[in-house]
């Protein structure tokens, strides 16, 4: 086995009502001026103001940038960076789900390295670490609060740029599940299926290790057991906390084993049509695994077992099929759209979507490499 490197924030605080402990840790870092990157909804809900007040009580000045869009753009990064510079901020705090986290990473990376966020598309393109960043998570989840992945939409090219860089790993991640109680059903379902995609893609990745395998399979089990409960009753504190841990485990898996064609293809849908990332992943996940089962059937059989399927007596191919069926059943149970047609994806766009998907860094670790025609066929099957 080749040597592997395991990336993770140096400190990670998880569990109900853990934000207060994390706030005290923030004060210990010695930051004096920080930029809070969030979205308009969390500002309206008062959550951003609560964080700002807690920082003020600890003698930390803060300014809020809440212009982050659901698929954060290069313009969002530039606007946040301008505010950071105007206020001489020495650190960044992200508050929200994957969008504020990714936007904050982009801001912090360019603040430290200069240039434009487009300069860092690809793998490890930066020269030095971003400004110190603390990520407060409110969804379960993208796991962006603890990864080296940063996804930014380049509106000029209609693509999502995959920035995979060890230098965008936050210093501290916070997963206070009490902040997730208010998530609506649709967001709970989409982000939960995103986490499942992280776990399964990491498990079948060519870069998987025993450590990422353990994280991935545990995440699959916890998501299969708890996502329907969290969607059915958002106030179920036990299910919310379980999902917070599950998405973090999935994050540890894919942050180090990387991903595959589900994400490579979903990024193109999000960039081209401005669609929700988690929903795109959920729709594509079973179809990509049908393609992957040609070489990863045994691994998919393991995932089926982790989802609670009895695979006794099933060979690898049968186990893989059982996994794919279980994914479809879970997606249906949490009301994920049946196909890309429901998202108004157009077949005439498949060629350009496939071309861009094959350039996405997430696809490099897929268990089998695809031709352009095969990617188009997967999109078509997902309609």
Swiss-Prot record:
EC number(s) from the headed UniProt entry: 1.1.1.1
InterPro entries, A to Z: ADH_Fe/GldA, ADH_Fe_C, ADH_Fe_CS, Alcohol_dehydrogenase_Fe
Disulfide bond positions: none
Signal sequence segment: none
CDD domains xrefs: PDDH
NCBIfam families for the chain: PRK09860.1
Name assigned to this protein: Probable alcohol dehydrogenase
Taxonomic placement: Bacteria, Pseudomonadati, Pseudomonadota, Gammaproteobacteria, Enterobacterales
């Amino acid at each position: 086995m080749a040597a592997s490197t395991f990336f993770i924030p140096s400190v990670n605080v998880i569990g109900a009502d853990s934000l207060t402990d994390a706030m005290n840790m923030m004060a210990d870092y010695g930051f004096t001026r920080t930029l809070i990157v969030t979205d308009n909804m969390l500002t309206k809900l008062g959550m951003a103001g609560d964080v700002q007040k807690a920082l003020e009580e600890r003698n930390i000045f803060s300014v809020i940038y809440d212009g982050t869009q659901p698929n954060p753009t290069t313009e969002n990064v530039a606007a946040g960076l301008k505010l950071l510079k105007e206020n001489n901020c020495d650190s960044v705090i992200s508050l929200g789900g994957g969008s504020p986290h990714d936007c904050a990473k982009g801001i912090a990376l360019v603040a430290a390295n200069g240039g434009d966020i487009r300069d860092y598309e690809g793998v490890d393109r930066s020269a030095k670490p971003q400004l110190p960043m603390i990520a407060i998570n409110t969804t379960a989840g993208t796991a962006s609060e603890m990864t080296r992945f940063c996804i930014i939409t380049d509106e000029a090219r209609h693509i999502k740029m995959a920035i995979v860089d060890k230098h965008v790993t936050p210093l501290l991640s916070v997963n206070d599940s009490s902040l997730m109680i208010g998530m609506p059903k649709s967001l709970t379902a989409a982000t939960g299926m995103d986490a499942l995609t992280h776990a399964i893609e990491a498990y079948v990745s060519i870069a998987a290790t025993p450590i990422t395998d353990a994280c991935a399979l545990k995440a699959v089990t916890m998501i299969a057991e708890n996502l329907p409960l969290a969607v059915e009753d958002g106030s179920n504190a036990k299910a919310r906390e379980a999902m917070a841990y599950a998405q973090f485990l999935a994050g540890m898996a894919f942050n180090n084993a990387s991903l595959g064609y589900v994400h490579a293809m979903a990024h193109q849908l999000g960039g081209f049509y401005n669609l929700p990332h988690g929903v795109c992943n959920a729709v594509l996940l079973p179809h990509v695994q049908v393609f992957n089962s040609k070489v990863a059937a045994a691994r998919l059989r393991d995932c089926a077992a982790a989802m609670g399927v009895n695979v006794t007596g099933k060979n690898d191919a049968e186990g893989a099929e059982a996994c794919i069926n279980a994914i479809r059943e879970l997606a249906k149970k949490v009301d994920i759209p049946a196909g890309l047609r429901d998202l108004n994806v157009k077949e005439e766009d498949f060629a350009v979507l496939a071309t861009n998907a094959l350039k996405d860094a997430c696809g490099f670790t897929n268990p089998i490499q695809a031709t352009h025609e095969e990617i188009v066929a997967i999109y078509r099957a997902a309609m």
